[in-house]
Regions:
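Preferential activation on post-signal-peptide N-terminal prodomains/segments
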Residues: 1-245
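Short, non-transmembrane alpha-helical segments in secretory-pathway proteins
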Residues: 34, 41-45, 49, 53, ...
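A generic structural signal for short, solvent-exposed coil/turn residues
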Residues: 98, 106, 273, 292, ...
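A short, polar/proline- and glycine-enriched secondary-structure boundary/capping micro-motif
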Residues: 124-128, 290-292, 318-326
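Exposed beta-strand-loop-beta-strand "reactive/processing" segments of non-cytosolic proteins
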Residues: 187-232, 261-307, 314, 354-384
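Short helix-loop boundary/capping segments
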Residues: 303-333
Length: 385
């Protein structure tokens, strides 16, 4: 669904729940159980009294053997102080507030606690979890459908020039069903009135693989694959790029008035350079299986003058069905070996996580269908491969 207001772009891409028996459930954005689980976890994390935390620690405790553990894989790395503001943590003086973190770990044993983790190898203790919140989360985990929990295994890296952080495991699965994707393609003439204040000045430019409209100051382009691109000549000169908060406020209003946001979008990256703040978003969806876009499925560039100077949007995913024949999967070790030559970070940084998803890909030729293929996603350091 498309929504006018910017959705909850900082919610976790996935929530991993490790049960007492060692089995794991991996809940991705779009899953019905994800929504209820995230609501409960967010309630437990909101308003924590972190005092003068968060101190650095050597490693995050893996939790007691008989107690569940929750891991929240956040969509982007933000500073500790930014997550503290988003979750309304109570603190008089936050230590290590500038460290980048992208993961929250909640242990639910006798000493239930909240931790943060981020590349390259930073781990922080946040606070003890109050007993009421610990009980509520533990009860929620106990009541989850047992069918959500699957076996996982450790990576076998003996013959690879790759290392992994302690505790990294992968789903023990050999095949997944083929997927079929339906997307909503943009109509250039319907989009025209959203991007040009005076349509009488607009003329069309035909390209081999795209169609464009321009009024001399702005260009709106739709490619054969359905990618919509908007650019304006307005720049920001030598002024400083906007802060993340300023860029999000401007982007939220601008995109909301020009067709709206996919409901399942999350923030993937924010870069400030040359007087422009560049926001890149991903789409994470799916019901039976996780489905996600390539990074930058939506891009919004905001100038220092709080104007959107570039916008890019992939077609909206309407439906993904999984009725095809089972597809054999390559092993995670084979995926690492395949990725290593093109991603030297895998040899320099330990693997922090590895998971399976259906990756949305544009067609190779105009008029062909978008596809969603089972793909191993590898995270090492700040990089996803």
């Amino acid at each position: 669904p498309i929504v006018r207001e910017m959705p909850e772009i900082f919610r976790p891409e996935r929530v991993v729940i490790r049960r007492r028996d060692g089995l794991r459930a991996e809940l991705h954005a779009g899953f019905p159980t994800y929504r209820t689980s995230w609501q409960r976890v967010r309630k437990a994390l909101t308003g924590l009294d972190v005092r003068d935390g968060a101190p650095l620690i050597d490693e995050v405790p893996r939790g007691e053997a008989e107690a569940p553990v929750l891991e929240l894989y956040l969509p982007t790395a933000l500073q500790v102080r930014q997550w503290a503001e988003l979750l309304q943590w109570r603190t008089a003086s936050l230590r290590n507030g500038s460290i980048l973190v992208d993961r929250v770990i909640v242990t639910l044993g006798e000493r239930a606690a909240v931790y943060l983790s981020g590349p390259p190898g930073f781990n922080l203790f946040v606070a003890d979890l109050p007993e009421a919140e610990r009980t509520a989360l533990a009860t929620h985990v106990e009541r989850l459908d047992p069918g959500l929990f699957r076996p996982y295994r450790e990576l076998i890296l003996d013959d690879l020039a790759v290392t992994a952080e302690p505790g990294v495991v992968v789903p023990d699965v050999a095949e997944l069903p083929a997927a079929q994707v339906d997307v909503s393609m943009p109509d250039l003439w319907e989009e025209e009135v959203r991007y040009f204040p005076d349509v009488t000045l607009v003329r069309q430019i035909d390209e081999q693989d795209a169609r464009s409209l321009t009024d001399g100051r702005r260009v709106l382009r739709v490619t054969g694959a359905g990618l919509l691109q908007y650019r304006t000549a307005e720049g920001s000169g030598e002024a400083a790029a906007p802060t993340l908060e300023q860029a999000l406020e401007t982007a939220g209003r601008w995109v909301g008035s020009r067709g709206g946001w996919p409901q399942d979008v999350v923030l993937h990256r924010y870069v400030r350079e040359a007087g422009v703040g560049r926001l890149a978003f991903e789409v994470h969806t799916g019901v039976r299986y996780p489905v996600q876009s390539l990074p930058g499925a939506i891009q919004v560039h905001v100038s220092a003058a709080d104007r959107v100077v570039y916008f890019e949007r992939s077609p909206t995913v309407v439906n993904v069905s999984f009725e095809g024949e089972p597809l054999p999967l390559i092993s995670p070790e084979a995926a690492l070996a395949h990725a290593l030559p093109a991603a030297p970070v895998l040899a320099a940084e330990p693997v922090r996580s590895m998971y399976l998803t259906y990756l949305l890909k544009p067609p190779a030729e105009a008029g062909a269908r978008w596809t969603a293929e089972p793909t191993w996603v590898i995270q090492a350091g700040h990089t996803e491969v």
